[in-house]
Curated annotation (Swiss-Prot):
Gene responsible for this protein: Wdr89
Protein name: WD repeat-containing protein 89
Pfam families given in the database record: WD40
Annotated Gene3D superfamilies: YVTN repeat-like/Quinoprotein amine dehydrogenase
Species of origin: Rattus norvegicus
One Gene Ontology term from the biological process aspect of the record: corpus callosum development
InterPro entries reported for this sequence: WD40/YVTN_repeat-like_dom_sf (IPR015943), WD40_repeat_dom_sf (IPR036322), WD40_rpt (IPR001680), WDR89 (IPR039328)
Key words of the record: Repeat, WD repeat
Keyword field contains Repeat: yes
């Protein structure tokens, strides 16, 4: 534990992205996987103005920007085998761009069913399947699937393979494929349910491996544990759950931890916790960590055990507003963070900042702010109580 504490505490800002022409919240970050982490690569950032910005990972220079118009984009993910970058759109599509090219037009377009509004998605570890979660329309909240493989007779537009419609009763806010098993996927919804599916099974009912209940609207899910046989979940009202799927066929309870509001029970040294950002499973340590923060931009590292969340250490001096996204490359102790101050920061051990951008608090027009799903969303609570 001391090692990870020192690694995190020793992170310092190496670079900030240049001030964009249109300041936006930075809602999601992913890095390209086709080159070794230490040799640089690309960074894709989801912005609240409905675009994805592509940066050089080492310099944080903005290379190009892709627009999701006419829809708003939700989520950002690089392919595992190439530099294609994906995002789900409220216009009922999942869009795929070649991040190396400046073309505004998507390389591929995965079309949903009529009336689909996609708010979450993921691509499996082999880049074969895309799954997107939709907002509830009438009585249906769909998980939609596509074949994402390129062929010699490739079509730029793809229709769905099919959909699951029986396992969620409200908006599907999160989708995450297993890191190494291409057939396993977990989904989370505003109905509070977190469902695990095995896509190698033919029908939806039999494919459902487990249903876990967070009792609140799901904001983040992920895989963890040895062989990634555990899942964790965060909620829009700052709850945290952790389940062990190894115990599905035993008498042992699958719930490892269930905290209704982490802000009430987590003691942060010389500070406080306002919200959760996401989770990180450290394979070498076999330990799950949770990243949280404050409304003034301080970042907290929390360790997760079956007794609760405990504060390890914190980073400060980088952001001036709520931090909304991060991407931590454990192999090189490299951290990327993005926030509501429109800043993209690269942190590395013992770094000395090579560029400087004034980090004033960002004031964003209310029309944009209303489109962005923030953490403590009363609308989710009201919808759930209805």
């Amino acid at each position: 534990m001391e090692k990870i504490k020192d690694q995190f505490a020793n992170l310092h800002i190496l670079r900030r992205s240049s001030e964009p022409k249109e300041p936006t919240y930075l809602l999601g970050i992913d890095t390209s996987k086709t080159v070794p982490a230490e040799k640089g690569g690309l960074v894709a950032v989801l912005c609240s103005n409905g675009s994805i910005r592509i940066y050089d990972k080492e310099t944080l220079n903005l290379l190009r920007e892709f627009s999701g118009s006419p829809g708003l984009l939700n989520g950002v993910r690089f392919a595992n085998s190439c530099d294609n970058v994906y995002s789900a759109s409220t216009d009922g599509t999942v869009k795929c761009w070649d991040a190396r090219l400046a073309s505004e037009k998507p390389a591929q377009l995965f079309k949903g069913y009529p009336s689909n509004i996609f708010i979450s998605f993921d691509v499996n570890c082999k880049d074969h399947i895309i799954c997107a979660g939709a907002e509830k329309v009438e009585d249906d909240a769909l998980l939609v699937f596509w074949d994402a493989r390129f062929t010699s007779q490739d079509l730029s537009t793809r229709d769905p393979l099919g959909a699951y419609s029986e396992t969620h009763s409200d908006d599907i806010t999160q989708v995450r494929f297993h890191p190494s098993n291409p057939n396993m996927v977990v989904s989370g919804s505003t109905d509070g349910l977190v469902n695990v599916f095995d896509l190698s099974v033919d029908n939806e009912e039999d494919a459902l491996v487990a249903t876990c209940n967070s009792v609140s609207s799901v904001s983040c899910i992920g895989w963890c544990g040895r062989d990634y046989k555990q899942i964790y979940c965060m909620t829009h009202d700052e709850g945290f759950c952790w389940w062990d799927l190894n115990h599905l066929d035993t008498d042992e309870p699958i719930t490892c931890l269930n905290i209704q509001d982490v802000r009430d029970v987590t003691d942060v040294k010389e500070g406080h916790l306002d919200y959760l950002i996401g989770g990180l499973y450290h394979e070498n340590m076999d330990r799950l960590f949770v990243i949280g923060g404050t409304n003034l931009g301080k970042i907290h590292l929390l360790s997760c055990t079956k007794t609760g969340l405990s504060h390890v250490t914190s980073l400060q001096g980088g952001h001036a507003a709520t931090v909304r996204s991060f991407c931590w490359t454990v192999s090189e102790d490299s951290l990327l963070t993005g926030g509501e101050d429109a800043q993209l920061l690269l942190w590395k051990p013992g770094a000395v900042e090579k560029t400087f951008t004034k980090k004033d608090s960002l004031k964003i027009a209310s029309s944009v702010q209303q489109r962005v799903r923030v953490h403590s969303s009363d609308s989710y609570k009201k919808r759930k109580q209805q």
